[in-house]
Amino acid sequence: MISSLHRPTLAKVDLSAISENIEQVVSHIPKQVQTFAVVKANAYGHGAVEVAKHVSKQVDGFCVSNLDEALELRQAGIEQPILILGVVLPDGVPLAIQENISLTVASLEWLTLAQKQGLDLTGLTCHIKVDSGMGRIGVRNLKDADNLIAGLKALGADVEGIFTHFATADEADDSKFKRQLSFFTDLVDNLTDRPRLVHASNSATSIWHAATVFNTVRLGVVIYGLNPSGSVLELPYNIQPALSLETALIHVKTLPAGQDVGYGATYTTTDEEVIGTLPIGYADGWTRDLQGFHVIVDGQLCPIVGRVSMDQITVRLPKVYPLGTPVTLMGENGGVSITATEVAEKRGTINYEVLCLLSDRVPRSYD
């Protein structure tokens, strides 16, 4: 989708806030660790290349979801280690070796397929994924982990790391977290050939369970200034949201009582009302379930009335404003703010999704 550069809708990314968030989290981890910044899904909507370039001297490497995301960073000149957290099938190995991209290997079946294809894994760096209770990808016992490490090394691979992912590190009840941690710790401690890097700490673990980190951490949503738990757990220190979403009024009119607004006529004016139109809609990631939410105009919360359309939304204004008046959808305006977590709570989802769904049609600018 092409970016719409000639309209006032814009996501502003504060790169210095991301740097400060990394510094804040790492300073609260009680031992020396390697830090990988997670920039998958276009850095959670913030711009993977721009973020990676800005923080490259602060971190030891980057994590992405798939091979194409890794290649984007390499093609942009990023030289630090890049680990793909998802599974790349063996036919992607030659390209990973060529571009010095580390792969996650999550099963003996992957190894068997590589052997059947006659692959030489010399030059490949990989990390073993352990399923300690998430139920997605990864080996589930010590024997499989040992066999996988030995088999990969026999084909020439450098098994640099082993890791797991916690399902509930961002919840108040830590019983499942403790079970996963115990499982993974026991497995790692009993490996025949333990890899150099051991990591289990995502953002939530690094914040609320910092004492449990191994020798590497993966920092994701927290570096973008979002609370990984939404509003479930209080953050023990301050972080700064790095993205604000802004637009401007493109149409303002006064409607008499009894006038319908938007598709389906789901909103009807009850009195004389000033209605403003904004150039953003569900094609931009501002989804239909945000009807009834609000934006900020001139330091005042203004409700979204009528359905969210593909390209436009309508809001009720306290008075007539001139065209071009700035409007904030996420961020601060006149001492009033809207957070991604508040947007997520209105939508019944998580703040991660709010930012990841901001489409390419919304240009990003960088400070």
Swiss-Prot record:
The keyword Isomerase applies. Pathway: Amino-acid biosynthesis; D-alanine biosynthesis; D-alanine from L-alanine: step 1/1. It comes from the Bacteria. GO terms for biological process: D-alanine biosynthetic process; peptidoglycan biosynthetic process. The active site is at K40 (proton acceptor), Y263 (proton acceptor). The modification N6-(pyridoxal phosphate)lysine is found at K40. The keyword Isomerase applies. Keywords: Isomerase, Pyridoxal phosphate. Its EC number is 5.1.1.1. GO terms for cellular component: cytosol. One of its GO terms (molecular function) is pyridoxal phosphate binding. Its cofactor is pyridoxal 5'-phosphate. Gene3D superfamilies: Alanine racemase, Lyase, Ornithine Decarboxylase, Chain A, domain 1. SUPFAM superfamilies: Alanine racemase C-terminal domain-like (SSF50621), PLP-binding barrel (SSF51419). Substrate binds at R136, M310. Pfam families: Ala_racemase_C, Ala_racemase_N. It catalyses: L-alanine = D-alanine. CDD domains: PLPDE_III_AR. Catalyzes the interconversion of L-alanine and D-alanine. May also act on other amino acids. PANTHER family: ALANINE RACEMASE (PTHR30511), ALANINE RACEMASE, CATABOLIC-RELATED (PTHR30511:SF0). Belongs to the alanine racemase family. This is Alanine racemase.
